[in-house]
Amino acid sequence: MKVVDMHCDTISALLAEKREGKAAELKENDCHVDILKMQRGDYLLQNFALFVDMEAYADPWEEVQALFALYTQEMEANREWIAPVLTWSDIEKNRAGGRMSAMLTVEEGGVCGGSLAKLEELYGQGVRMLTLMWNYPNGLGYPNLNKHKRKAARIAAEEKSRTEAERLVRQYLNTPDTENGLTDTGVAFVQKMEELGMIIDVSHMSDAGFYQVLSLTKKPFVASHSNARAVCPCVRNLSDDMLRSLAERGGVTGLNFCADFLTQMPYGEHNPGTIAAVVSHAKHIVNVGGIECLGLGSDFDGIDTHAELTGADKMENLWNALKESGFTERELDKIWGENVLRLYREVLTA
């Protein structure tokens, strides 16, 4: 089975490099993901997120449109090897034609400014998955990791002993928001997304928001790049109850290669990331939710380089490690892509 990855931030990384005057292109670059690395990694489909840091731009909508323009340009420049998909049949057509597929997503629903018309405009531009929020509260709801609170925790930690500093930072990282969920506008967005056939992504969302999405929807949804909280207690990961609920709905969570979402190191120590840690999360998620709820969500180009999974061309190393840990090839086929493709087939319009 070829790789189907639900999340990377490569388009945002490329635009940042271009603004620095670098000759950054999707065909070949120094990022985690490019066409050549994907070919070596045997990819079928990559979700390309248009990620916008809401507090870094005066007009987040303008920024997401700049990212969309670059994505469109790169798809045209690389049309021999990869093509965008809007429907399930597009994926099948690309596969039959020997081309990889690209699915356009947006990471930060706040770019719409609460406008359902802008949400529909994104859909018209080809966006088929939306991560409702990143690490700030927005007009749609609340995240579990709030960058404003992180800054306050780190400032407070600087004035404390190492033990107390670690306690403060861990308290921030490991305490989920079980009270603040979706706003009324967020509820309307979730309902409109399900109506459109746009996949709802709950990665980054507060626990309260997750359960609201569960109650508001009927179709499967995803946590495109989230791991298991029982293995690494950071609240960017899903609790066992959330994993079971996601699985019962037919949803999928994507293994995230971010080292800090895989293991927690002592305060101040560098976390390089290991394949063994990814395997631990995979085994736990499958034990809790079953083999059907697990996929891939690397977070490539949105994270520091993982020491053992340095890019899209290294995916075989993870396959081999998972196989050595006891996963069968049939189970690996499901993790590598079949589970995500099953969900796409169900949610995306024909």
Residue ranges and their predicted role:
Residues 2-5, 45, 101-105, 128-129, ...:
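Structural preference for beta-strand elements that scaffold enzyme active sites
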Residues 7, 38, 87, 126, ...:
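Conserved, mostly hydrophobic/aromatic
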Residues 19-40, 319:
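Short catalytic helix/loop segments, enriched in acidic residues and glycine
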Residues 194, 310-350:
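Mid-to-C-terminal alpha-helical segments outside catalytic/metal-binding sites
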Residues 256-257, 288-312:
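Short acidic/histidine-rich active-site segments
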